[in-house]
Amino acid sequence: MEKEQTKNQQENQKKSQKLQWHPAFCSALRLELLEDAANLEFTDEFQLTEKPLQIDCTVVKVKKNCRIKNEIGKIFRKHNIFEYKSPKDELNIDTFYKAVAYACLYKVLPNHVDEIPAEEITITLIRDRKPVKLMQELEKSGYECKKETVGIYYVSGVMFPVQIIASSELDVDMHVQLKALTNHLEESLMRQYLLRVSAFSEREKNLADVVLQAVSYTHLRA
């Protein structure tokens, strides 16, 4: 009986942590791409099927040929799928194939054949630490993982363009929103984050609050 209760408590704790981090990521992503917000449409937990099968976040370019200023959007096509892993979750080979499967489902979701062309879909996998083991396994499987810029790695040979983002490696001045999604937040980074938030509008500050709540919750439980 005690073992069962302990198991349930652990499952509830994992669920609670996920509920904290994923809304924080979606909010951080909006702030990260704030400069390009007029050209993008965001959907959190995009529902793929009637049963619970969700993409963490989708980002759709309003104008197909618009240029995204933020470097994480360099890879963007029309439809862009994000799969996020919290600091305590592993970004592994199964995550990779799940994201590819989700992209395939997303492609066939509309009512008309080829309404969303495969070449208009990209996948972004993101976690705070570089998933070294995953990238090694991808290389062994015949894919090529190439560093595009600091913290951003492109995976070639996949049916969709794929990038892996290690948010802890990103440039702090350019990507403080995503770098804040960590369970090891340094004081200097927190100060820089709060300084950036102070210049936000009320709506943007509400998004930042979601990020801060997740980070604060994690540090209080550490």
Name what the model sees in each region:
Residues 1-221:
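Elongated, amphipathic alpha-helical interaction scaffolds
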